[in-house]
A protein has these predicted regions:
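Transmembrane helical cores of multi-pass ion-transport proteins
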Residues: 1-367
Length: 367
């Protein structure tokens, strides 16, 4: 499409709408991917989700084979990444830095696999992966992630629930559970009543408003924590700097088979998710995507996300369609979205720090 003042205005409006629609997914799925690190490190997951929606989206959109490409963290692939991270966290020989490095390596290898699929022109064949196999696999992982939200929902420290006794019951915060369950209900209601609105964002806003309203009436100690301040500064491509040393360690060596297997699963599910999403965008934009180019673009986007410490990404049709309906017609829409999220991450860190974990846990229960 030829650029004009009208199209640029539409892309600017579409980009801002896309950024708003992407925000809740970036926060929630970033937290899903790194949730096994525990609530005390929730800010790492939040930042990783935002970095993916900024850097990964920027790179993938620049090379995409879809009319209006918007990429970011997706439930399907972040669930797989979260399961891999859970295995790393369970190993006492690995510290937090090693876990983050191996998680980034997993995303990077997944990106390389996707680039290979595209280069070999296997995009068409990815669609033939049996859906029941993927559905069963994802349901199993989703249950694990849902159980992992129990500490956030109840307002109890995750380490307190790892013992065999029930002493942690005395630490349960009922009001935290009220906020989480109310948030989940808002997401479900929004998805049914207002299908054109991003249900996760509606839940984020509604749940956060409820949280702070209740805090005016109930003592602060009755609620669980907020996510805390995000690590400051611009995202830099240093997440894999320690990868050679970490991978060479004996502690990491035993996780390499799981790392490669998880990367392959992320690559295949992400490829399938992206191609199905591209078809959905085609139906709205009356265009036709290029499957193999899209796989290469998503692979490069995942590699870029890994370099900057982000989580895995895939094409996000809901955000792309929202941008189209707001006037976006070119990839500039995606670039504006990434820029808007970057400004929010750098300038709105204090506001993001006040987001309640109970609200994000409620979103994860249903999304």
């Amino acid at each position: 499409m030829r650029l004009s003042l009208t199209s640029i205005r539409g892309d600017l409006a579409g980009g801002l709408v896309t950024a708003v629609a992407s925000l809740a997914f970036a926060l929630t799925f970033g937290l899903v991917a790194l949730a096994p690190l525990g609530p005390e490190r929730a800010e790492l997951g939040i930042r990783a989700g935002l970095v993916a929606a900024i850097v990964g989206n920027l790179v993938a959109s620049a090379l995409s084979g879809t009319a209006l490409p918007v990429s970011g963290p997706r439930a399907s692939i972040t669930l797989v990444q979260g399961a891999f991270v859970a295995g790393l966290v369970a190993d006492p020989a690995l510290d937090v830095n090693a876990t983050l490095v191996l998680s980034a390596v997993c995303v990077g290898i997944a990106g390389a696999f996707q680039m290979l699929l595209g280069a070999l022109r296997l995009g068409t064949f990815v669609k033939f992966v049996p859906y029941p196999v993927i559905a069963g696999f994802m349901c199993g992982i989703a249950l694990l992630i849902a159980f992992a939200q129990v500490p956030h929902v109840l307002g109890v420290a995750s380490h307190a629930m790892r013992g065999t006794g029930l002493d942690w019951l005395g630490a349960v915060r009922p009001w935290t559970a009220v906020v989480s369950l109310a948030t989940a209900a808002i997401v479900v209601l929004a998805a049914r009543r207002w299908p054109r609105l991003p249900a996760a964002l509606v839940g984020l806003l509604g749940g956060t408003a409820l949280y702070f309203a209740l805090r005016l009436l109930v003592a602060d100690g009755a609620f669980g924590p907020t996510i805390g301040m995000l690590p400051g500064g611009l995202p830099l491509p240093t997440a894999l700097a320690d990868a050679p040393a970490v991978i060479a360690s004996s502690a990491a060596a035993r996780h390499l088979p799981s790392l490669v297997a998880s990367a392959a699963v992320i690559a295949i599910i992400g490829a399938l998710d992206s191609l199905l999403g591209a078809a959905a965008i085609d139906s709205v934009t009356a265009t036709r995507h290029r499957a193999n180019r899209e796989l290469v673009a998503q692979g490069l986007g995942n590699l870029a996300s890994a370099l900057f410490g982000g989580v895995a990404i895939a094409l996000s049709p809901a955000q792309g369609i929202a941008g189209w309906r707001a006037g976006g017609r070119t990839p500039i829409t995606s670039y504006v979205s990434s820029l808007a999220l970057l400004v929010l991450m750098l300038g709105g860190a204090r506001a993001l720090a006040e987001l309640p974990l109970a609200v994000l846990a409620g979103i994860m229960l249903v999304v």
